[in-house]
Amino acid sequence: MQVVNSLRSAKQRHPDCQLVKRKGRLYVICKSNPRFKAVQGRKKRR
């Protein structure tokens, strides 16, 4: 899963990509091609 600043280009990679909001984070999910998954707003680990 990629962590990106903007999901605009991530949701346009495939026609089946959907934008979903879960627990305050934005996710792009794609059931037909799971390598296009992405997330915005993930907390950084130290």
From Swiss-Prot:
Which keywords does this Swiss-Prot/TrEMBL entry list? Answer: Ribonucleoprotein, Ribosomal protein
Query: Would you tell me the Gene Ontology cellular component terms?
Result: ribonucleoprotein complex; ribosome
GO BP: translation
- What is an example of a Pfam family matching this protein? Ribosomal_L36
- Gene Ontology terms for molecular function: structural constituent of ribosome
**Domain of life according to the entry:** Bacteria
InterPro entries, alphabetized: Ribosomal_bL36 (IPR000473), Ribosomal_bL36_sp (IPR035977), Ribosomal_L36_bact (IPR047621)
UniProt xrefs under NCBIfam families? PRK00831.1, rpmJ_bact
So what family is this one in? Belongs to the bacterial ribosomal protein bL36 family.
Name the HAMAP family for this protein.
Answer: Ribosomal_bL36 (MF_00251)
Name it. Large ribosomal subunit protein bL36
